Amino acid sequence: MLVSVVLNIMNEENHIADLLDSLVIQEGPIEVVVVDANSRDRTREIVERYVQQYPGLVKMYIKPGSRGLSTNFGISQAKGEIIAFTGGDCIANPFWIKELRKSVMEGNAVVAGKTINMGLKAWEELDRVELLYRGVDLSYPSCNEAFKREVLEKVGGFDTWFITAEDIDLNFRSVDAGFKIVYNPSAVIYHRTKSTLYRFYKQAFWNGAGRKQLTLKHGRLWGNYDPMRMFKQKMTFWSFTRLVVAIMGYIGFKLFDAKGPYAKKLLKAK
C-alpha cells in the first residue's frame, strides 16, 4: 500500500534536511508531499534539492494558511491509500513507515506511533496531557499518526479554523465516526523540543488557546475531565509553568477571539 507522508512546514531550514534524510530511506512504496506554508528562510531551497534528487518521491507545494488548510491541501495532492503525518522538526526512525503500514494492513484505520522528545532533558520528560473520549486518548499528536484515506474523506480532514489542537479535533471526529485509534510503540518519531524559553512558552500559550477552541466546538469533551489528574502526575517547575501559560492562552482566546464558527453552537447547547 502506498503511504503518502504529508508535511506542513514553515521556516524549518535548520531541521528539514534531517527529516527528509530520514524519510527517503523508508520502506516503500512511499511519497513525501511537502507543503510549505510560506517560509521566509531557506526551507524551500533545501526541499527543492530533495525534489531534484528524488524525483517522484519528494514533491513540494506552496500553500499559505493555517496548519489545517495547508495540510488539507497536501492531502488533496497525495496519492496514497494511507496518509501519514509528521513535523518539520522531527526525525523518523528507519522502520517508521513499515510499522505504520503494518498496523493499517492489520485492519486498523488510524494509527498513532511513539513520539520521543529530544532536547533539554527537563523538557524531554514533560508528559502529554491526556484527553479521553470513549476510552480513547485523543491527545496523540499529528507528528506521528497515519490515517486510511477513507477516514479523512469521511470526517472531512482537518478543521481549518483551529490555530492549534487541530490534530486533537481530527482524532475526536475520527473516533466519533466509529474509527478506533491504535497505538503502535514501534512506529517511532523523534521530536525536537523547543530550543528557547520564548518558544517553549509560546507553544504552551497557543496550546492553551487550542484547548479553548476545542471547548467551543466540543464542549462535551470536558464533561468527565478531572483537572486534578495533572497535579497527581509528576509536577515539576516546567510542567507547572507550562500549565500556567497554557491557562493564560485558554483565557486569552476566550476573552479576545472566541467569536469563531462554533461560539453560537455552544451557546445554543447550554
Each predicted region: which residue ranges?
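Short, acidic, metal-binding catalytic loop of nucleotide-sugar glycosyltransferases
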Residues: D21-I30
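A conserved acidic beta->alpha catalytic loop
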Residues: D36-E45, C90
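Glycine-rich, basic loop-to-helix element that forms the pyrophosphate-binding segment
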Residues: I62-A78, S139
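Short aromatic/hydrophobic "clamp" motif used to bind/position activated sugar donors
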Residues: I83
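Conserved donor NDP-sugar-binding/catalytic core segment of glycosyltransferases
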Residues: P94-W123
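A recurrent flexible, glycine/aromatic-enriched loop bordering the glycosyltransferase active site
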Residues: N117-M118, E130-F147, I163, D169
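A short, conserved alpha-helix in the catalytic core of glycosyltransferases
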Residues: N144-E145, V151-G156, W161-V188
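Non-catalytic, C-terminal membrane-associated alpha-helical segments of glycosyltransferases
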Residues: Y198, K202-K270
